[in-house]
Design a protein with these regions (language model features):
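Short acidic, glycine/serine/threonine-rich loops at helix termini
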Residues: 85-89, 113-119, 229-233, 290-293, ...
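Short, solvent-exposed amphipathic alpha-helical segments in soluble enzyme
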Residues: 89-95, 233-237, 294-301, 328-332
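A generic, well-ordered mixed alpha/beta core segment in the N-terminal half of proteins
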Residues: 91-161
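N-terminal glycine-rich anion-binding loop in soluble enzyme alpha/beta folds
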Residues: 2-60, 64-67
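Ligand-binding beta-strand-loop-alpha-helix segment within the catalytic cores
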Residues: 135-226
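Glycine-rich anion-binding loop/nest that anchors nucleotide
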Residues: 73-82, 102, 218-222, 247-325
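C-terminal functional extensions of proteins
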Residues: 2-11, 16-24, 54, 275, ...
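Glycine-rich phosphate/diphosphate-binding loops that line cofactor/substrate pockets in enzymes
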Residues: 59-73, 209-213, 265-275
């Protein structure tokens, strides 16, 4: 770098420019990786240098250091990432105490269970973008529920679990009890009401790992899921209800307000001794819901000395323009008091299924 050229720039601009570091290794990439104690991490550090790859590496290294210093991580999961087997990585992070709370859409949460009970019944269609509307209708009529390149086996998953959950809801109504959606689901594991698919690996189920570690799960907007729709139909008492159909009191289910109360207590307790980072996989309500926690504690509960989010890292491909973006970018979050000027932030504009495995591998020391 020509330092004379740099010195002509304004002080603020000079701070933004970094010198190209010396080569990180000697010899070939293959030789370096083969001799490394953590080969995946070694390969990542040698090759993920610029743009989204560089942002992914820097984010992973920051999170690794954050954990080393006693920090904790909240992970949020959007879309249908559980169907796309992100749970393989997330489950291991939970087992290794790298993730301490998960916020997931109702769909992602239930799909983790569906993978557990019906893994061998899933099917794929790699060239899904070439399907015609008529072919989509064929798939519908055959009972094949498509999520981009993946078919969810409804009969072998949803319909297997529904009777068990229905009985739990009915029993709760009789006793006047109410629980969170994830608490009802966890009883499927605890009471051994479901079994893993013979061709599935139970260790790949992040919801099972969260159950074993007893870490909190938050499900904002539970109604926006297959089982949430089913619960809504059981609690509906309007004109469309058929005579003799099962009716359940909706009060057996705790709501998003209850989840927010849970997060209040969790964050205040955990942040006393640990900075907490926010890793957002995709966008939507799974992330927008918990990110509001800190400003709500500050401005609504009037606890102004609450610790800010230590860092915010988002992986997603939705741009902030044209109304398609959900939430706010890292800097914009500062204006809402969701982040401070000292919070680490990084936006990785890429596919979660491509980037998250690298971050997970580095955090796991692979």
């Amino acid at each position: 770098m020509d330092k004379k050229k740099i010195s002509k720039l304004s002080k603020g601009l000079q701070k933004l420019i970094l010198e190209e570091p010396n080569a990180k290794t000697t010899g070939t990439v293959s030789g370096h990786v083969k001799s490394a104690k953590t080969p995946v991490s070694a390969y990542a550090e040698r090759t993920l240098n610029h743009l989204n790859a560089g942002a992914a590496l820097q984010s992973a290294l920051w999170l690794k250091d954050h954990l080393k210093k006693g920090g904790k991580i909240v992970v949020t999961i959007a879309g249908a990432l559980s169907s796309f087997q992100v749970g393989v990585m997330l489950a291991e992070l939970i087992r290794k105490n790298k993730v301490h709370l998960v916020s997931a859409t109702g769909a992602n949460h239930e799909e983790s269970y569906y993978r557990y009970v019906a893994h061998s019944h899933y099917a794929y269609i790699p060239r899904y973008t070439e399907l015609t509307p008529e072919q989509e209708a064929e798939l519908r009529d055959a009972g094949l529920r498509r999520i981009t390149d993946t078919f969810l086996p409804e009969d072998e998953s949803v319909r297997i679990m529904e009777p068990h959950l229905l009985k739990m809801w009915q029993d709760a109504e009789k006793t006047g009890e109410k629980y969170f959606p994830h608490e009802y689901f966890r009883r499927l594991f605890k009471e051994k009401l479901i079994k893993p698919d013979p061709k599935a690996n139970p260790s790949d189920c992040w919801a099972y790992a969260a159950y074993e570690k007893d870490i909190p799960i938050v499900i904002p907007g539970f109604e926006d899921s297959t089982m949430g729709n089913i619960f809504a139909s059981y609690t509906y008492q309007g004109a469309l209800k058929n005579k003799g159909d099962t009716v359940i009191d909706s009060r057996v289910m705790k709501t998003g307000l209850d989840y927010f109360h849970l997060m209040y207590d969790w964050y205040i307790k955990e942040s006393k001794n640990s900075p907490i980072a926010f890793l957002q996989l995709g966008g939507g309500i799974a992330a927008d819901f918990p990110i509001c926690l800190v400003p709500s504690i500050k401005h609504d509960l009037k606890h102004h000395n609450v610790r800010d989010w230590a860092g915010f890292i988002e992986i997603g491909s939705s741009p902030m323009s044209y109304g398609s973006y959900s939430g706010a970018g890292g800097k914009e979050k500062i204006t809402w008091d969701k982040l401070s000027t000292k919070s680490y932030y990084q936006i990785i504009q890429s596919d979660v299924t491509v980037v998250f495995p690298w971050i997970a591998a580095i955090l796991l020391g692979l």
